């Protein structure tokens, strides 16, 4: 919209920057409010001013020069009436910011005026266009009074003393609507300044006289008003202050008009009441400018457009205008707007941290976010500060309520971040605590030195708590209740205690495992020695270095004693190491109870290993062979035909057979009963957990639910296995016996006595030659000494045995090669066939003879063959 060649923002215009250059139409002649008012205030940089702005409205009859006065006084460009026409120019309500006023000397009076003066040009009254329709007149007056600090009444000097000409009808309307407003807002009781500018002032009538005339007329109008209850005795000066100024004729005295306008403009600045100077009412007189703080409607500049629109909406819809309610509604609206704007900046600062935290939680790996605490504090401080800066100007109760709501929104999100940060610190702290303790324990184990597990846990726990508190303090936001992290710290400490206890139990489990391995090693060596002694039936083999061979009957006594001693030593080691873990008595008791059960399992597994069929049969055979092949002195026997092989064989076999029932049951020789395993292990400790029992092997006679008795637990070889061992051992023993018998029979052949005489006669010359030759004699002497030493060492038997074995092997090899040679030729095959025929014819006689000479040897042949097979296995 263009007025006087200048651009204005009209209602409904499509706007760009130049439309706001000289002002804006607030309300058009059709009573439509301009929604672009806020854009104009932003364009003029008034919005950030807060309360540092002033609003002036001008009233007066149509075509009396109101717009001209404003343009001259404030440098605005409101539309003015053409000098060639007499018609309405200002339609509706217009608003423009003061543009400054240049003096003739080039000085800028803007430096003397207050900042951000908004000038509102109101449509003139008593115009022919509206005639008797005073609705817009009343509504515009109410709007101006509700929003403006200063109401300029533009009248001519010759109109003073008139009713309509002096706008007394309009002022009566102003007073009436003012009473309505004040009735709604008795607490604040806002005041306004009625500034009468008397145009075409000649000076003939003093300004003071004109002032008195106007005040008398105003008081008369005020007294004639029908006042609400409680305001019957109120005075006009309770609600209004008055100021007066005269201006010369613009056309007849242009230079003087300009000078007076410049002087008048200097009054539009901030003023104050001087309590030392009182006016007729008894209040302090106004000093300085005309803008007093009590005139200001206390509507921040950024909310003025919304406030004005709300006021006009109430007015145009003929609703009772309630300024406090409008101020509250404005405060709610603006506080919500400011809150949203503040939250945008808050989102930019906090959303990245929320996204990172949510992503880490979704990935199952919460992370401690660096810089979160400072970001939270800065974001909250800036948000609240920015809100306070913008919103604290509005209604205090609404401002406080909206501030609390904003803080709740901010704190809700910050609390979630805070708790997420503590949760991540909790989880990472627990993990680092576990890893640190484990690493320290491994380092102590690698050094080979003893380490104090309790001290390690105490040290790492202290470091973990310090780190958690450091993270928590770094994330704390001051002046917030939710920043108290003592509950989370207490929970963290409890979890550290739980994890520390779990690590201690795990370490005790590992200690128990190491002790168990130590027990297994010691038991393995000791039990091997005891069972190896069973495999030797001769003195010296399984006997100690000094003393006699231990009795086979006391085998289980020795095993039990060794077992008890080793486990007691292990318990001592376990208790000593457990003391460095700061373990409780209950935990030590559970550990010892588990150690005893595990140790019995190790012993039983070792015994079962020794009792395997192959192992026990081998030991029985070795025991029998030692008793059969060696004499009581441990010397190997050389079987001769006159030896009582049958008796020796029977004694050795029966002695070895007694081991099978002995080994079949774990019994102590003194009591002939199983050892007190149930009492030795003891009852299950009351502090034992299911986890302590889940990896334990049930033990008969100890665990009631196992269904096995102690006698069954101590049975090492079942009846079926005993019988099988007996049969197989006898077969093995029979084979050894047959071998011995063959050896004795093979030595029956003797050299005839005449052979020695023949040897002496035929070898006499050689004997004499040897005796006469020193070399031969020396060789003979050495051979004789060697034979004597061999005899003294009782080595002739083994030498002969080895010689016979070598000769037998050579004979067998010769026979094999001869057979291969014969099979390779036709003549050899014919000779072998003839030899086999003769052997078949004489088989019966030879077999009969063998039966007679061996005394029933043929009846035992099958047993001998089976024994040979077992011996080969």
UniProtKB/Swiss-Prot annotation:
Biased composition (Acidic residues): 691-701
Domain of life the protein comes from: Eukaryota
The entry's keywords: Endoplasmic reticulum, GTP-binding, Hydrolase, Membrane, Nucleotide-binding, Transmembrane, Transmembrane helix
Stretch list, region Disordered: 677-701, 841-873
Transmembrane feature ranges: 751-771, 775-795
UniProt keyword annotation of Transmembrane helix present: yes
Gene Ontology MF terms in the entry: GTP binding; GTPase activity
Membrane-side (Cytoplasmic) residue stretches: 1-750, 796-873
Membrane protein topology class: Multi-pass membrane protein
Gene3D superfamilies (alphabetical): P-loop containing nucleotide triphosphate hydrolases
Catalytic activity, EC: 3.6.5.-
Lumenal topological segments: 772-774
PROSITE patterns per record: G_GB1_RHD3
GO cellular component: endoplasmic reticulum membrane
UniProt function note: Cooperates with the reticulon proteins and tubule-shaping DP1 family proteins to generate and maintain the structure of the tubular endoplasmic reticulum network. Has GTPase activity, which is required for its function in ER organization.
Family: Belongs to the TRAFAC class dynamin-like GTPase superfamily. GB1/RHD3 GTPase family. RHD3 subfamily.
Protein name listed in UniProt: Protein SEY1
Natural source organism: Paracoccidioides lutzii (strain ATCC MYA-826 / Pb01) (Paracoccidioides brasiliensis)
High-level lineage: Eukaryota, Fungi, Dikarya, Ascomycota, Pezizomycotina
């Amino acid at each position: 919209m263009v007025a006087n060649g200048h651009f204005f923002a009209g209602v409904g215009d499509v706007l760009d920057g130049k439309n706001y250059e000289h002002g804006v139409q607030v309300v058009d002649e059709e009573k439509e409010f301009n929604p672009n008012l806020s854009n104009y205030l932003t364009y003029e940089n008034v919005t950030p001013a807060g309360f540092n702005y002033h609003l002036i409205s001008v009233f007066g009859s149509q075509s009396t020069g109101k717009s001209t006065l404003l343009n001259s006084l404030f440098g605005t460009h409101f539309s003015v009436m053409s000098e060639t026409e007499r018609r309405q120019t200002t339609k509706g309500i217009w608003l423009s910011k003061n543009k400054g006023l240049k003096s003739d000397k080039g000085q800028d009076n803007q430096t003397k005026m207050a900042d951000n003066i908004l000038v509102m040009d109101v449509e003139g009254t008593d115009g022919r266009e509206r005639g008797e329709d005073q609705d817009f007149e009343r509504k515009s007056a109410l709007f101006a009074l509700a929003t403006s600090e200063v109401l300029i009444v533009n009248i001519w000097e010759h109109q003073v003393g008139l009713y309509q000409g002096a706008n007394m009808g309009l002022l009566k309307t102003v007073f009436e609507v003012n009473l309505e407003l004040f009735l709604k807002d008795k607490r604040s009781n806002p005041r306004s300044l009625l500034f009468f500018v008397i145009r075409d002032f000649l000076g003939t009538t003093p300004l003071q006289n004109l002032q008195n005339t106007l005040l008398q007329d105003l008081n008369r109008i005020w007294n004639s008003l029908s006042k609400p209850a409680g305001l019957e005795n109120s005075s006009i000066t309770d609600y209004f202050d008055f100021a007066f100024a005269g201006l010369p004729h613009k056309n007849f005295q242009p230079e003087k008009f300009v000078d007076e306008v410049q002087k008048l403009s200097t009054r539009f600045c901030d003023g104050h009441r001087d309590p030392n100077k009182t006016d007729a009412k008894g209040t302090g007189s106004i000093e300085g400018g005309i803008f007093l703080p009590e005139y200001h409607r206390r509507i921040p500049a950024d909310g003025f457009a919304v406030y004005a629109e709300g006021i006009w909406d109430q007015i145009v819809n003929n609703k009772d205008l309630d300024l406090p309610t409008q101020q509250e509604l404005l405060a709610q609206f603006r506080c919500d707007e400011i809150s949203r704007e503040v939250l945008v900046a808050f989102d930019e600062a906090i959303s990245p941290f929320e996204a990172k935290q949510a992503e880490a939680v979704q990935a199952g790996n919460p992370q401690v976010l660096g810089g979160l605490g400072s970001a939270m504090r800065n974001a909250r401080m800036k948000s609240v500060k920015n809100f306070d800066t913008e919103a604290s100007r509005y209604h205090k109760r609404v401002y406080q309520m909206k501030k609390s709501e904003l803080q709740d929104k901010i704190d809700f999100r910050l609390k979630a971040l805070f708790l997420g940060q503590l949760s991540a610190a909790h989880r990472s702290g627990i993990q680092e605590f576990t890893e640190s303790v484990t690493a320290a324990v491994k380092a102590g184990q690698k050094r080979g030195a003893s380490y104090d597990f309790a001290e390690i846990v105490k040290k790492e726990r202290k470091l973990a708590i310090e780190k958690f508190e450091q993270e928590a303090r770094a994330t704390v936001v001051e002046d917030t209740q939710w920043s108290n992290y003592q509950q989370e710290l207490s929970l963290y400490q409890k979890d550290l205690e739980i994890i520390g206890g779990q690590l201690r139990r795990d370490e005790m489990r590992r200690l128990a495992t190491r002790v168990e391995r130590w027990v297994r090693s010691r038991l393995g060596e000791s039990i091997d020695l005891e069972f190896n002694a069973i495999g030797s039936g001769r003195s010296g083999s399984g006997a100690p270095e000094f003393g006699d061979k231990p009795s086979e009957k006391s085998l289980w006594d020795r095993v039990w004693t060794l077992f008890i001693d080793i486990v007691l030593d292990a318990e001592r080691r376990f208790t000593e190491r457990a003391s460095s873990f700061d373990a409780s008595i209950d935990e030590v008791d559970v550990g010892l109870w588990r150690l005893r059960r595990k140790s019995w399992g190790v012993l039983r597994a070792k015994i079962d290993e020794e009792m395997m069929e192959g192992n026990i049969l081998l030991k029985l055979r070795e025991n029998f062979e030692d008793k059969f092949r060696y004499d009581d002195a441990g010397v190997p026997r050389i079987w001769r035909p006159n030896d009582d092989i049958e008796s020796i064989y029977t004694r050795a076999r029966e002695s070895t057979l007694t081991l099978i029932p002995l080994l079949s049951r774990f019994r102590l020789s003194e009591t002939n009963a199983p050892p007190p395993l149930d009492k030795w292990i003891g009852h299950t400790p009351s502090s034992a957990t299911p986890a302590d029992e889940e990896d334990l092997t049930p033990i008969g006679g100890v665990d009631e639910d196992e269904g096995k008795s102690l006698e069954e637990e101590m049975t090492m070889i079942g009846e079926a296995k005993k019988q099988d061992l007996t049969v197989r051992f006898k077969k093995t023993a029979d084979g050894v016996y047959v071998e011995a018998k063959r050896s004795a029979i093979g030595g029956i052949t003797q050299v005839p006595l005449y052979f020695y005489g023949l040897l002496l006669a035929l070898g006499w010359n050689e004997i004499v030659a040897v005796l006469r030759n020193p070399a031969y004699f020396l060789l003979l002497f050495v051979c004789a000494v060697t034979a004597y030493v061999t005899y003294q060492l009782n080595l002739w038997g083994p030498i002969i045995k080895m010689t016979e074995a070598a000769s037998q092997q050579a004979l067998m090899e010769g026979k094999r090669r001869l057979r291969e040679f014969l099979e390779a030729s036709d003549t050899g095959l014919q000779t072998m066939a003839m030899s086999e025929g003769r052997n078949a014819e004489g088989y019966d006689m030879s077999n009969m003879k063998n039966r007679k000479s061996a005394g029933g040897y043929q009846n035992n042949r099958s047993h001998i063959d089976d024994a040979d097979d077992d011996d080969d296995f």
